[in-house]
């Protein structure tokens, strides 16, 4: 407990000095910005821009203002604070790393991205390691995000496998009004920690561009815990006509991370060199009654990892004479078109094609096999899917929504995924929602073909989520609050089952039986002062590591002109640090409090 408290305390102190420089060409506010409340329009729950009140599922929105106020190079700490039910692990001042000893695990309602049950998207495109099937936490940087939309609950109808527990959709930055805006941020603090970021945005007539770059590094609060990252993001857009536009973007980041092991069992030479990249091209149309898009995307990664060794002289774990290497990629084509066929109606149809995979090998750098290569895996797989979503407003007080996806995997077969929900628009700006939705996940290439306990005969994981949500806006929208109740029933979870006399085997024997409550409230006291809070309680019949039972965050903020101050307190209780596996082992939990002042 004391060690965890010390680590978390360091996060609040890591930035001792921070300042920002802005160069802005003033322009009149765009009409769209005057009339549309940004946090009421989302794209994650419907593919097209949709009023959040008409969605049967729950979507949390974290805007650019919150992202900038957090002064964090990574988006994950901000999401942990602002989104009830979402928790991310951390191991130090900066950086998450990959492989053994990594942090940055994202869990939502007890479903983890590390196990492929939570999907991260960038502008609606899936982002995960092609072989392992999990998100890469250090790739999700604040510099690219205009806002982040978190759909809490299954989103498999729209996004397929890995969206089993929900999605985190990073909506990239743009420029709404003509002009040039440049932003720079530099921070320096404890343990030789440096974080920098610069962004230039331009809009001239029909042309828009965004170019960002960053460099971040730290020595870490322990020996052999250094982290260094540099990367850049660029986005170009052009409005072909009032109805058609095209955009393309590219994001590349490289980081070097070291993993020091535990305090009681430290490690040496556990170093990682990781490069991740993504690029996409989209052509979009919007005719009012109908809108849609055709997009192509390509993600890639190059990993070089030294697993390291324990420094205990009594341990037989000696320096490794090999290095793990991998190349992975994922490409895809997505198309959707949404149309208003008659009054109050919206019909969306779409199709997706994904191809993902890669190769992994060990390269020997010493010993008798020096210079040799030992292959681990070289696999690629395909998914093709079609989906339809039907929405109907009835009498101005009720919205009915139903969707169905048919998803085919080249190795596993076909999966059908339905969902349905109701949204009641009641007097006094009350919104009441009820939904039932199926989520699923195909086994990853790692689970089927890489490392014991691999099993090529695995089946998809499946779950159902049942949810009721209540929310209300008061005082002209200055006060908002909401509460969600959910129950998750899942089966066929992939677990490593021990076998006598041999290695464990991955099998579809696990179950999910989770239930919980999530609540949030925000109050704009005046133009300068605001307060907000969120809380989540999670009951897990089968607990998982890094999923807390209780999470509370409260904050107060003051902003006037160019000056702003925000303070927040996060309380986490019942955070599982170890759980029983197949009836063996012990369950341990820890609690902590983290205070931030920015």
PLM regions: where:
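Membrane-embedded beta-barrel scaffold of Gram-negative outer-membrane proteins
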Residues: 206-207, 291-307, 359, 425, ...
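Gram-negative outer-membrane beta-barrel transporters
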Residues: 393-397, 487-489, 507-580
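Outer-membrane beta-barrel transmembrane domain signature of Gram-negative proteins
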Residues: 317-401
């Amino acid at each position: 407990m004391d060690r965890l408290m010390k680590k978390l305390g360091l996060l609040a102190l890591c930035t001792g000095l921070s300042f920002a420089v802005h160069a802005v060409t003033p322009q009149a506010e765009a009409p769209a910005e005057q009339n549309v409340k940004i946090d009421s329009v989302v794209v994650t729950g419907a593919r097209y821009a949709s009023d959040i009140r008409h969605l049967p599922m729950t979507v949390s929105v974290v805007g650019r203002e919150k992202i900038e106020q957090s002064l964090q190079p990574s988006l994950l700490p901000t999401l942990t604070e602002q989104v009830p039910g979402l928790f991310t692990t951390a191991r130090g001042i900066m950086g998450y790393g990959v492989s053994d000893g990594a942090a940055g695990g994202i869990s939502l309602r007890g479903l983890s991205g590390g196990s492929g049950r939570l999907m991260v998207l960038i502008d609606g495109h899936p982002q995960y390691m092609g072989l392992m099937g999990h998100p890469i936490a250090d790739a999700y940087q604040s510099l690219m995000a205009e806002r982040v939309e978190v759909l809490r609950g299954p989103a498999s109808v729209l996004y397929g496998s890995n969206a089993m527990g929900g999605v985190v959709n990073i909506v990239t930055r743009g420029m709404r009004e003509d002009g040039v805006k440049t932003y720079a941020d530099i921070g320096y603090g404890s343990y030789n920690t440096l974080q920098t970021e610069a962004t230039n945005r331009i809009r001239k007539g029909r042309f828009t561009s965004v170019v960002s770059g960053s460099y971040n590094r730290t020595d870490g609060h322990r020996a052999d815990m250094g982290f260094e990252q540099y990367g850049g993001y660029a986005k170009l857009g052009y409005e072909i006509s009032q109805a058609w536009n095209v955009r393309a973007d590219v994001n590349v980041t490289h980081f070097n991370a070291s993993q020091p092991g535990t305090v009681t069992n430290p490690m040496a030479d556990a170093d990682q060199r990781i490069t991740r990249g993504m690029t996409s091209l989209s052509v979009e149309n919007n005719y009012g009654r109908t809108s849609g898009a055709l997009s192509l995307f390509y993600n890639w990664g190059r990993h070089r990892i030294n697993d390291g060794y324990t420094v205990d002289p009594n341990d037989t774990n000696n320096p490794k004479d090999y290095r793990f290497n991998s190349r992975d990629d994922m490409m895809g084509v997505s198309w959707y078109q949404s149309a208003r066929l008659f009054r109050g109606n919206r019909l969306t149809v779409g199709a997706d094609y994904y191809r993902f995979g890669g190769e992994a090998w060990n390269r020997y750098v010493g010993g008798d096999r020096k210079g040799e290569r030992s292959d681990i895996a070289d696999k690629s797989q395909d998914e093709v899917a079609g989906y339809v979503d039907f929405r109907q407003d009835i009498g101005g007080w009720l919205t009915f929504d139903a969707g169905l996806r048919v998803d085919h995997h080249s190795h596993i077969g076909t999966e059908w995924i339905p969902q349905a929900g109701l949204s009641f628009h009641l007097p006094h700006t009350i919104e009441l929602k009820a939904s039932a939705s199926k989520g699923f996940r195909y086994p990853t290439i790692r689970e089927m073909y890489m490392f014991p306990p691999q099993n090529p005969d695995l089946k998809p994981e499946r779950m159902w989520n049942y949810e009721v949500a209540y929310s209300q806006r008061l005082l002209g929208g200055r006060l908002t609050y909401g509460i969600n109740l959910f129950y998750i029933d899942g089966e066929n979870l992939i677990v490593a089952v021990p076998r006598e006399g041999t290695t464990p085997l991955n099998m579809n024997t696990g179950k999910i039986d989770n239930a919980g409550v999530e609540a949030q409230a925000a109050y704009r006291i005046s133009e300068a002062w605001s307060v907000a809070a969120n809380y989540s309680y999670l009951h897990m019949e089968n607990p998982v590591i890094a999923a807390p039972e209780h999470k509370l965050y409260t904050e107060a903020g003051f902003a006037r002109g160019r000056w702003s101050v925000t303070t927040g307190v996060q309380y986490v209780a019942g955070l599982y640090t170890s759980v029983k596996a197949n009836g063996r082992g012990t369950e341990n939990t820890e609690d902590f409090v983290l205070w931030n002042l920015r």
